[in-house]
Every structure is written in structure tokens, then in C-alpha cells.
Amino acid sequence: MILDDLVAATCQNMLARQAQKSLHDLQKEAAHITVSREFPFEKSLAQQKISVVAEIKQASPSKGQIVPSSEFDYQGIAKDYEVAGVDAISVLTEENYFKGSLDILKTVAADSATPVLRKDFTIDPYMIYEAKVAGSQIILLIVAILTDEQLKEYLSLANELGLSVIVEAHNEEEILRAVKANARIIGVNNRNLKDFTVDFDNTKRLRQLVPPEILFISESGIKDRSDVVTLEQIGVDGILVGETFMKAADKLAAIQQLRGEK
């Protein structure tokens, strides 16, 4: 199963990083960083207009190499996103399958005033502290790879550190688990992480299970303005878009097109 492979690779890479820097050392670094309770990303999601999370990634398990490594100007991409006024920038940090890194996250976070999401397969508190130290304001928790106890523990830790959390679900059971864990933001991934097929109706089907006070994001498979209009009509607060923007030669125009601004 692809998801199992991703989790295994994530664990192996995390253990290698832990050998270089202990959890205790990370915690000491995090303790020197100011904790804000502003949660700007959540405020953006709560506004009337649909929010846009624009992703930076050069590869994925489903598409392979999206952008040639020689053309992967992640700093330039982040600047384009910021100029376009996106509500958050998602940075892949998974190394093996998405060819991301914490260094990319650190650079983007340091250069940008826009909230940054660490997009990874968070499986341990170590990775949450890493995200904080790297400058991230948002993390991702995937229900499918965590127990109920882990979900609650990691949500609590993230809140202590001033991090917003997108809790990602793919089916009815996972939505209910996210709600039970008191998630403030739930994201529905239209891409099945087990076989990477896209089912855009997933958001439509699962939206009704999420209480209105919980912010709701649709992730993956969003290609054009008509998709966004459909999502707006069913009460989606935000969209996460990766491949569509990464493949666009003019990223500002692509973002404006999805927003209906041109």
C-alpha cells in the first residue's frame, strides 16, 4: 500500500534526523520562539470568501516529477504566491516521494509573511516541534495514520505551540474521528492516499458530516473555476491546490482564474 510506504519512509527519515538532533534539543529551541494565539490562517478561513492554500512541491507519488529539479525555484514560487495574496503556502517536506525538505520549509517561512503549512505525514511529536522550529504556522494531521489518542495528543501539543492544524480525512469514519478529537479545521482529501485515485465528489459527500463551526477545506483534484464554484456552493471555507498551480507558467493568473478574478 502506498500510504504504508510513505509512513515507513517518514519514520526512517525522522529517526535519522533524531540521531542528529534530539527531541529535548528541539524542545529547547521551540521554547525560545514566541507563541502567538492569533491563528491567522483560521481567521482567513472564517472570512466570507473562499481561502486558497497554494502548494509548493516538485514531485508526488501519483504524478512523479511535476517540475524538473533544475527548474524548481521554490523561493520564486513562494513570492508569486505571496503576491497573489494566497491565504497560506503549503510546503511538502517529505523527502522520498515528494522530494521536499525541511530546508525548503525554513527558507519559505523565513521569507514570507503568509502563514506556512508543513505538509508531511506527521507521526510523532518530534515532527510537530520540527515544524514550529522551522517557522511553520500550520501542520497537517492525517487521521488514517494516527490513533484517536495520537490525534488528541498532537492537536493539544500543536495548540500549545500556537500552530493551526488541518486534520485530513477521506471517509465518513475519519470525519467522525476528527470531529470527536475536537479538530478546528478538517480537510477532505479528494485523492485516495491508498491508491491515489481522485474522487471529487468526496468533498460534497462528507461536507454534511462536519458541524458548521468547524472550518472545512477541500484538497486535491481542483482544476478550474467551475470546481471552485461547486465547492463554494456546498459551503467549503478553503481549497488546497498543488499540481494545478505548480504546472502553471503564470501562477498569479492561475490563482486569479480559480478565484474568478479574470
Curated annotation (Swiss-Prot):
InterPro entries: Aldolase_TIM, Indole-3-glycerol_P_synth, Indole-3-glycerol_P_synth_dom, Indole-3-GlycerolPSynthase_CS, RibuloseP-bd_barrel
Gene3D superfamilies: Aldolase class I (3.20.20.70)
Enzyme class: lyase
UniProt EC number: 4.1.1.48
UniProt GO MF annotations: indole-3-glycerol-phosphate synthase activity; phosphoribosylanthranilate isomerase activity
Pathway assigned in UniProt: Amino-acid biosynthesis; L-tryptophan biosynthesis; L-tryptophan from chorismate: step 4/5
Gene Ontology terms describing biological process: L-tryptophan biosynthetic process
Statement: the UniProt record of this protein carries the keyword Cell membrane: no
Key words, A-Z: Amino-acid biosynthesis, Aromatic amino acid biosynthesis, Decarboxylase, Lyase, Tryptophan biosynthesis
Catalytic activity entry: 1-(2-carboxyphenylamino)-1-deoxy-D-ribulose 5-phosphate + H(+) = (1S,2R)-1-C-(indol-3-yl)glycerol 3-phosphate + CO2 + H2O
Entry-linked PANTHER family: INDOLE-3-GLYCEROL-PHOSPHATE SYNTHASE, TRYPTOPHAN BIOSYNTHESIS PROTEIN
Family: Belongs to the TrpC family.
Protein name: Indole-3-glycerol phosphate synthase
Source species of the chain: Leuconostoc mesenteroides subsp. mesenteroides (strain ATCC 8293 / DSM 20343 / BCRC 11652 / CCM 1803 / JCM 6124 / NCDO 523 / NBRC 100496 / NCIMB 8023 / NCTC 12954 / NRRL B-1118 / 37Y)
